Amino acid sequence: RLTAKPLKFTCTGPHMLTKVLTDRFYGDRAKLAMAIAEVLRDQLSNIDASVVQIDEANISGHPEDQEWALAAINHVLEGVKGTRAVHICFGNYGGQSVQKGFWKNLMPFLNELKVNHLVLEFARRGYDELDAFKELNPSIGLGLGVVDIKDNLIESPDTIAKRLETAEKTLGPGRVPFIHPDCGFWMLQRSVADGKMRALVAGRDLYEGRK
């Protein structure tokens, strides 16, 4: 065992995989997505982790795919034993966002996900779009991105605490049960990633002390 702490397992989702694969068999993206979803569901049903997270970095720029993406993602989630999470961001290539879009365009999709909580990008984009999440299904926890993974600057604990305060003022107490980086740290040096995680913890503690 690598840790005594609760384990989160992450997996690229069926929409993202469908958008980047060449289809030489199905001739239909919805059918391809569901075939991928069936394989992922079978594999993830055997994962003994506290949280299983599906990563989708393409749907943010393609709300027109919501119907078939939702069916495929939910099919995967139905096979998860532990807590179900879905991460959505706007992509990252060389420190730049890949997708263009707005969270409000995804609200019907987000509200129909069979998920316990969302893991969303905010730090890079800012928090002006938080108002849209007043319409989020109250049974779905909102995970707030408070660390920008496309910038080498390490946030101060005070900056992170203020981001949490903004979210609570906008959405109300208890609507943001999770905080996290916007996405993965693979583009950053280890020292920067470690510094950002330390700042995240310190910012959370500072925010909790102010409440």
Locate each region found by the language model:
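Domain-level signal for soluble alpha/beta catalytic cores
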Residues: 1-211
